[in-house]
Curated annotation (Swiss-Prot):
InterPro entries: SWIB_MDM2_dom_sf. This is Transcription regulatory protein SNF12. Residues 39-51 have a biased composition (Polar residues). GO terms for cellular component: chromatin; cytosol; nucleus; SWI/SNF complex. Residues 231-246 have a biased composition (Low complexity). It comes from the Eukaryota.
Amino acid sequence: MSKVMKPSNGKGSRKSSKAATPDTKNFFHAKKKDPVNQDKANNASQITPTVPHSHPSDMVIPDHLAELIPELYSFQQLVDSEKRLDHFIHLRNLHMKRMVAQWERSKLSQEFLYPHLNFPNVKFLRIFISNVSENQPWQMDTNNEADLMALENATWTMRIEGRLLDNVQANDPAREKFSSFIESIVVDFKNKENDNVPSTKFNAAPEENATEGPSDKKLNLNLPLQFSLPNGDNSTTTNTDQNNATMGEETAKKDMSSTTPKLESVKWQYDPNNPVDFDGLDIKRVGSENVECTISILRKSSPEEPFMSYSPQLTAIIGLKSGTSHDAIFSIYKYIHLNELLTNDESAFENLMGNRNNHNSNTSTSKMLDAASSQVSIVKLDTQLITLLPSSLKESSPDTMKLTDLLSLINSTHLLPLQPIEIDYTVRVDKASTYGELVLDIEVPDVNALKFNNTQRESQIGAAELNENARELEQIKPKIALQDKEITSVLSNLHESNKRYRFFKKISEDPVKALNECIASTSNALKVLSGDEGYNEDMVRRANFYKENEAMLRENIEVILSNGRM
């Protein structure tokens, strides 16, 4: 088979070809004769470029450095606390992920069984507070004597009504009434101090018209008919008018006090034995003056998850003002666990038991003590936990306390009933109606949404907390990384300064020995970087080699890392 050749450029190309032949032969000949140079050339082409030096990621403090700088002990405590906190957060995230995974597996079946799964656990109850006025003086014709005599019938009616904000029709018989969400309603009226004393204006009117004689319109608003004299005898008119004026003044005083009587408090309390369903509560009273009052509305707590208020001492520790008893116990246990206040040393608690005899404990606490007698956990009381103790125990200044006693103390003393919603309201009689002027929305528990079991509800809460924690962690990660970078830079500078300090200290103590060690170390580093270790292959394969030469190997690795060779 013939070989196709490309046309050459003529003599010049042949000449250059012949001239290149001896050089090429000499090159291959030299390459075969000098394999060492060939290996060096290959090694030079395979050497990786120097990697830029990065900041170290560890925060290890050597013992000799901690001895020189005592403040590093506090830094080490912060590092240990950070490790414990990271450990707790990691365990908490694993717990929530496990709950979310269990909930996701049964999500389809639970959505079929419980249609309210995707709804929140609270609803909103809209409350309207208003009043209407009837037979008030401004509603009457003052020129009509009959209307003036009927002023004692002036009344007002205050109405407190509520409606759940949902899609249920008002005429639906299954609709939840206003009373089903309320535990109690209390209305406290603020009575004036001089209710039974006639006003200054009333007393001043007869004095101005004393020379004109008494007037029926001003004095005798409800004068009986038998006191008037139809015969028109002028001789007796003056005496009769004086008697009428006296009786009219007494009657007017009585009427004046009756129009502003002392109002007693009104209270409605839910009775489980005799429940009453209603959408509004009406309070009707006699009066022709504005009345100030305070309305207290206490929401009904859910049986599945009773809601309670926390004491100020407990709030200062766990950071929550209200919640369930489970939330309070779990939060206080987290506080004890994070601060490492839990111990199993029971001997330190014996002295406290003698001082606790005067403290009244409930039956549940005694039962818990008996149940926990076989296995007791002791809590070290810090300054925060001491604030939870009653005054009888604070006087003895205890250092420790049983965990069961502490939890029972929280349940009995620091879990308070849910505080009512207080509203200041003024009953206005200068308007026919104030409907729509005062409207407020309050949160009430959704009974249907709270019918799930605790595991499913915790799974939903855990999923929300997991997402919230992940988002917050992503937001603070750059700040943490920046602070870690600054800390590691400071530690790196401390290490470098420590090396210089130790080097110059050795030179000051024994210059010859220190310089010889420095030369040997530099020579060893050069040998490591050049790759000429000089180790026997059989020795390197044995585990004892690494155990016996650990310090030397660590130094070699540090040399390679510091020069960017790895």
